[in-house]
A protein has these predicted regions:
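Intrinsically disordered, low-complexity linear regions
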Residues: 1-7, 47-50, 60
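Catalytic center-proximal scaffold of phosphoryl-transfer enzymes
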Residues: 1-38, 79-442
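Short, intrinsically disordered, charge-biased short linear motifs at domain edges
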Residues: 32-42, 68-75
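Short metal-coordination and nucleic-acid-contact micro-motifs, chiefly zinc-binding Cys/His arrays
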Residues: 39-49, 64, 77-80
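Short, cysteine/histidine-rich loop/knuckle motifs that typically chelate Zn2+
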Residues: 51-55, 86
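Cys/His-rich microdomains that often coordinate metals
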Residues: 54-58, 91
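Short, isolated positions in well-ordered beta-strands
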Residues: 57, 75-77
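Short Cys/His-rich "knuckle" micro-motifs
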Residues: 60-64, 94-97
């Protein structure tokens, strides 16, 4: 088929470059809509035979209007209706082309663009962005319905595939030199507003990484300069997680466990020599760790641990009361004990501080005893190259949940929230395959 569309553009002589661009874009979209209608018309001309009896004698009986939303705007297609002279039945040749729409009005390319825009921005912003960038005329409600339907299907596919991978027998252990040296797993939750329950609901996120690369160190001059004020400290080595996968769900924690275990098998071609799991010590994370990563080295991230212990010392210092110097000494002492894994001494120190104080000061002691298996020597872990902070998983929660789902006034149903994070994890995982300079989310 050959389709020819002629263009005539009238542009004022005083038009600016931006005005010229907008006018050319508008006329180009009109030409694309006209070419689309002509292509459908030629497709109708090529189908001469009746789909019921195969006869080629037919009579035109008018047209039936059909509106299709495309990437370049809404197109009104006059479908021609014919009457077969052999069997007497009517048919529309264009119906075969519209079968893939399944009774809808949105084309497949526009659906894919709506999925991408809807899982990246609020629905109204996504509708406006598509209209501005490509001329697509699709409402925010249509984007929401398309995203929820496809996202729920994708979430079910991810879960079924993860359960299939986890139920399959593990690959035989290969030679140690072919195995990944380290597999990092991080898990955490992110809270969003809920339409179903007060207080919100928790979305569960995990990130799995099999390769860590050092970032280039910034240049540092040892000479004095008036343009650089403040303390001159040597830069710290920063790292980037190269081979990673995100998984997330708003369903039960068991779903995330299967997704994380399947992601661990996908990022590591060979069984890893060692697995390190970093989390905040939530009970559901411990349950999934015991089920899917029983041999992992479990690390309670340092930020959560020290925040709670520091708060307990501050409460005790205010109630005693302790002077600022004595309080800072307790901070330094307990921080040193916990950093080097001397948990028993830290518990004894907290007990001596909390003597005669209310239960608020004793919560840190209970938490330390409860999290004892996950607390070790952070100095030793740091020397081994293990992450001890929560930056890896906190960043994952921010990318997967917070940036899209924690806007002002947003409240979610659990199935729809799961649909959004299923598509967002697909977007992030496919984006990380690209080189760093080509990524949309570096």
């Amino acid at each position: 088929m050959q389709v020819q569309v002629s263009l005539t553009i009238e542009i004022a002589a005083s038009a600016s470059l931006a005005q010229m661009e907008h006018q050319v874009q508008d006329i180009g979209q009109q030409a694309m809509r006209e070419a689309f209608k002509q292509t459908i018309r030629q497709g109708e001309d090529q189908q001469q035979a009746c789909p019921h009896c195969g006869a080629k004698q037919r009579r035109l009986e008018g047209t039936v209007r059909r509106v299709i939303a495309t990437l370049f705007g809404r197109v009104q297609v006059p479908r021609r209706r014919f009457r077969c002279q052999g069997c007497g039945r009517s048919f529309c040749p264009a119906n075969a082309l519209f079968a893939e729409l399944a009774g809808g009005t949105v084309s497949r390319p526009l659906q894919e663009a709506a999925w991408l825009a809807g899982c990246s921005w609020p629905y109204r912003a996504a509708s406006a962005a598509l209209k501005r960038l490509s001329g697509a005329d699709i409402s925010a409600e249509e984007i929401r319905l398309l995203l929820n339907r496809h996202g729920q299907q994708r979430a079910a596919q991810q879960q079924a595939e993860a359960e299939r991978v986890c139920s399959a027998p593990a690959q035989p252990t290969e030679a140690a030199e072919n195995a990944e040296p380290l597999l990092l797993v991080g898990g955490d939750g992110g809270w969003v507003g809920s339409r179903e329950q007060r207080g919100g609901m928790e979305g569960k996120v995990a990130v799995v990484c099999a390769q860590v690369a050092d970032l280039p160190m910034p240049t540092r001059s040892s000479t004095f300069s008036w343009s650089q004020r403040g303390a001159r400290r040597p830069p710290r080595q920063r790292h980037r997680l190269v081979k990673r996968r995100y998984v997330a769900t708003f369903g039960p924690s068991g779903h995330l466990g299967h997704l994380a275990a399947a992601a661990a098998r996908s990022v590591s071609e060979a069984p890893p020599r060692h697995v390190v799991l970093l989390a905040d010590g939530a009970q559901w994370i411990k349950t999934q760790q015991a089920r899917h990563f029983p041999q992992a080295t479990c690390i309670l991230d340092w930020a959560h641990l020290w925040r709670e212990v520091r708060h307990a010392i501050a409460v005790a210092a205010r109630a005693k009361p302790l002077s600022v110097g004595e309080r800072d000494y307790q901070f330094s002492l307990h921080r040193s004990w916990l950093w080097y894994g001397q948990v028993d001494q830290a518990v004894q120190g907290l007990r001596s501080l909390a003597t005669g104080l209310p239960a608020e000061a004793l919560e840190a002691i209970t938490n330390l005893e409860h999290q004892r298996p996950w607390i070790g020597s952070y100095e030793h872990w740091r020397k081994l190259g293990y992450p001890v902070g929560s930056g890896m998983i906190e960043r994952a929660v921010a990318l997967v949940i917070n940036r899209r789902m924690k806007k002002r006034g947003m409240r979610w149903c659990r199935p729809n929230a799961t649909a959004v994070v299923a598509l967002r994890t697909d977007l992030r995982n496919s984006d990380w395959i690209l080189p760093q300079r080509l990524r949309a989310f570096p």
